[in-house]
Amino acid sequence: DVFRMNGHDRHRIRLRLGMLAHNLLVEEYPLAERDLAPDGESHWLLETEVAGFAGVARFVAGLLDDVEIVDSPELKRYVADYFRRNAAVIAD
């Protein structure tokens, strides 16, 4: 997938990205550019399929204030579970 993950399962995701998230996505994952569409003056929508949530979740977690998960409840649960599992690490 565009986040360089592989596997047989496919999950459709949709993210709304601010300018920072958009620029970092295109720089770090150039294949994502084909799945991006403008959404107003300073936002973009990424609609793509991923092989697993680990790669995209890492991207979302690092830019949480500039990425909105849209119509992707499985990804929302994955990210929320990731933060719950690791809460002790960031609480110390």
Where are the model-predicted features located?
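Polybasic (Lys/Arg-rich)
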Residues: D1-D92
